Swiss-Prot record:
Positions bound to a divalent metal cation: D12, D13, S43, N91
GO cellular component terms listed in the entry, alphabetical order: cytoplasm
Cofactor note: Binds 1 divalent metal cation per subunit.
Swiss-Prot/TrEMBL cofactor(s): a divalent metal cation
Compartment(s) of residence: Cytoplasm
Catalytic activity annotation: a ribonucleoside 5'-phosphate + H2O = a ribonucleoside + phosphate
Name this polypeptide is given: 5'-nucleotidase SurE
């Protein structure tokens, strides 16, 4: 499959970000790659969609004045149809935990792809932050994304023949910053740990704070083995096989309420 693999590559950090450059260089050796990515930073926009977007020619494909979801729709339907795989990333910053997935532009691009029945991978890299070097000055070179690139290309080459996408709609991959030795790969599930807080200052402002990230830096997390966050904090590559959202199951209690609705009016 890898010899004829056709890939649409997008992200939410913008087409000039180092993370998408790292994946483009890695996949250019094994696939036919077309980049369709936002022209500017679209982090945390979720699946926000536009009605019209302006496209710009780029050496790697196209820049889009829009969101990651816009890029997938425009790419799959108009700019590079018949792709085998959509890859979003590599995001500079992890996308882990069940509550994060719907916010992430990176993951949302992968989700958008699944509604076209095109398998996808969302690829992100965990940067602990803290310390003497500001977060935005970390992982500024392609080499920092080596683990993420290795994992993504490995899975792209082998997942189809292994039947992975017969059971999963998309893969959410989170890797550490590359070290001297390659990181190991673990199959995980999204963590359910949630630690958002809000403080009202009494003067018209409520400050929202996600405490999970600072707790991760000190390993002060209750996430059990087998979760994406635990794997990443322990220095492993996390791969979560996921289905597109909004699935449903038979619900007897709701059936009972529905059956008596008209009687209540």
């Amino acid at each position: 499959m890898s010899e004829s693999l056709s890939v649409l590559l997008t992200n939410d950090d913008g087409i000039d970000a180092v993370g998408i450059q790292a994946l483009y260089q890695a996949f250019d050796d094994i696939a036919e790659v077309t980049v369709v990515a936002p022209t500017d930073d679209q982090s945390a926009v979720g699946r926000q969609l536009s009605s019209d977007v302006t496209i710009h020619e780029h050496d790697w494909g196209y820049g889009i004045d829009g969101t990651p979801a816009d890029c997938v729709v425009a790419g799959v339907e108009a700019l590079c149809p018949d792709v085998d795989l959509v890859i979003a990333g590599c995001n500079k910053g992890a996308n882990i935990g069940a509550y994060v997935l719907g916010r992430s532009g990176t993951v949302s691009a992968a989700v958008e792809s699944t509604f076209f029945d095109v398998p996808a991978m969302a690829v992100s890299m965990y940067i602990p932050g803290g310390g003497d070097t500001p977060w935005h000055k970390q992982a500024t070179e392609v080499s920092a994304f080596a683990d993420a690139s290795r994992a993504a290309t490995y899975l792209a080459r082998h997942a189809f023949d292994a039947g992975v996408f017969e059971q999963a709609d998309y893969l959410n991959i989170n890797a550490p910053v590359a070290a001297n030795e390659p990181a190991t790969l673990e199959v995980t599930r999204p963590s359910r740990v949630y630690d958002m807080t809000a403080e009202h200052d009494g003067n018209g402002t409520v400050t929202l704070h996600d405490r999970v990230w600072e707790r991760m830096r000190t390993d002060d997390i209750p996430d059990p083995s087998g979760t994406d966050r635990r794997a990443v904090v322990d220095g492993h590559i996390s791969v979560s096989p996921l289905a597109a959202p909004h699935t449903t199951e038979h619900h007897e209690a709701l059936d009972a309420l529905a059956s008596t609705y008209l009687d209540s009016i």
